[in-house]
Structure formats: structure tokens, C-alpha cells
Amino acid sequence: MPKLEMMLLVLLILPLCYIDAVGPPPPWNMEDEIIEHWQKLHCHEISDLTPWILCSPEPLCGGKGCCAQEVCDCSGTACTCPPCL
């Protein structure tokens, strides 16, 4: 077998071995990425101690604990939002 053909064969087989050793890539969840991007644009995180509570300058409902700033009750490091109607 000529050297060029041998080199091409090795270059074709080598990536297959690497992919098998590493395993398949994790599934991509577009919904979580969209929610995270939306929260970065519209929400303000109050405290590192309560990352699940977010206050927004707009009256928003749902979306992982996001509520309007005027109804978001914050004292110290804790914040609470009223339930959405």
C-alpha cells in the first residue's frame, strides 16, 4: 500500500478511536439555555445565597421565581415573591 493511502487510512481511523474513547457528547438542552439567556437579560439576582429568587424590573410571572421588583419583598439577604395570579 502506498504511503499516501496508508496515511489517509490512519487519519480516517484515528478520529473514530478518539470519539469512542471519549464517548458521545452530552445532549444539548436548548430550553434551559434559552431560560438562562432570558434571565440574564431581564432579571437581577438579589443574592448569591438565594440564587433561585430573582427580581425583575417588569411584572413577569413564572420563569423560575422571577417577579416584579415592586412586589419583591427583600430584607437582608432573603427575598420573597408573591405567588403569580
Curated annotation (Swiss-Prot):
Q: Does the keyword Transcription apply?
A: no
Its signal peptide is 1-21
Prodomain positions: 22-40
UniProt's post-translational modification comment states:
Contains 5 disulfide bonds.
UniProt-recorded Gene Ontology molecular function terms: toxin activity
Keyword Ribosomal protein tagged: no
Tell me where in or outside the cell this protein is found: Secreted
Top-level taxon of the source organism: Eukaryota
Which keywords does the record carry? Disulfide bond, Neurotoxin, Secreted, Signal, Toxin
User: What coarse category fits the chief subcellular location reported for this protein?
Assistant: secreted
What's a GO cellular component annotated to this UniProt protein? Answer: extracellular region
Q: In which tissues is it expressed?
A: Expressed by the venom duct.
Q: What family name appears in the similarity comment? A: Belongs to the conotoxin D superfamily.
Q: What does this protein do?
A: Probable neurotoxin.
Comment text on domains: The cysteine framework is XXVIII (C-C-C-CC-C-C-C-C-C).
Q: What is this protein called?
A: Conotoxin Lt28.4
- According to its UniProt entry, this protein's organism is Conus litteratus (Lettered cone)
